[in-house]
């Protein structure tokens, strides 16, 4: 990406918004919501989706100013650079091309002068062929039994994204039918409890293990891979590994050394960041093994639909751009540090944890892309739970405590509708009644005057008063098919990118995860030498020394 030492906060567009905040402080959502023309202008439709951001603390004037900020940040140019394969991940000198992972076969997207779409489809075709062999039973395990159970080993982006999609599809009628008789589990944590939970009830004879590590050196993933290799070889012998383990990796030498046939390794590329990799073999392979490639291809098409919308739609009607600009407004101008992601769909229970990583690992930065300290806050603390569970958990704080902008995600048609005779509404209507009510409750609140008219006792009025003026947006999906899941993923991926582009940071590196890894190496060496040679603790501060001493004295780890 072209470098510039100017910070976005030095621009007139940023300063204009800073001054505009004083006007917003005098405005309540109760008043903004009376303007029907404003509300209508804040409804956006695309490909079956409906976005309503009228409950944001933003008059039309605010949106105009945010669009000016997008121009000042050269957002159009930055989006083009991403799609054109320029090395916008400057600290690692890499392109950022997760959009190529779901591009149509005839698309042209170049990295370093080479069309990468053909490479992507070569891998997708290989996944399709392999998954069909496994699912049909033409590929069997070492003892001749079909491989109906899959454990995918990965961590971070190699785990959270595929788990989100898997959980979203489990109860989709088409996907459910395709997955009959099959299981897909995800192993991420090096805590041995996670291993134990994953292998409970599984037979090594019918289990296929997918090891996801680009370099085949990721510490946690490879330890878990060795653990499951031991589980397989103990039951079936060392030769069974080639039949029961495959890899998603580019390091074919280490794949072969591990005991996996390099022909059963599925590639991905340096221009795919881990948290953006769910549309690569990282996600497509395990998901295709569970649901069949045809279902997963619909997921890719949904994401591609949003990619094209993001690339070509004017900003005032561009869903990811509008969402990204509103997040910048909430974080950097209104001072809201967090965002609640609230899907009114149990099938989306793993969506917030995935977006938590996509957002916080991407935009949790303190310096500009040129290395300058930022004089403003970036990034959001993302969290969430499905409705209505969250209402009985943390909504109390959202309504009467800190102001936390909320994303409400609703589904028109339930994956698994239930209609009970004698009930006023269906189960899904009951759920969606809350989806429609909560944003208004946050926006309007309840005044002391209203409570007095309801004859609420004076001593309870302060406790039952709701300030309102709490921003939210609503995103309504027609249903939750594989296609819609792809749409939802891409909207949030691009929203995060827009925020980073406006803030002038690198949303595609993650140096913050490295320091802890380095320090863990020192601890690991100490644990090994203390357990095997009785070496005294050395080189740690008082606090860490005390904790390590207690751990070594009381843990029951065997001598190695």
From Swiss-Prot:
A Gene Ontology BP annotation from the UniProt entry: glycolytic process
Catalysis performed (reactions): alpha-D-glucose 6-phosphate = beta-D-fructose 6-phosphate
GO cellular component, one term: cytosol
EC numbers for this chain: 5.3.1.9
Superkingdom of the source species: Eukaryota
Keyword annotations from UniProtKB, A to Z: Acetylation, Cytoplasm, Gluconeogenesis, Glycolysis, Isomerase
Family named by the database record: Belongs to the GPI family.
Quaternary structure annotation from Swiss-Prot or TrEMBL: Homodimer.
Protein name as catalogued: Glucose-6-phosphate isomerase, cytosolic
Higher taxonomy: Eukaryota, Viridiplantae, Streptophyta, Embryophyta, Tracheophyta
Encoding gene (name): PGIC
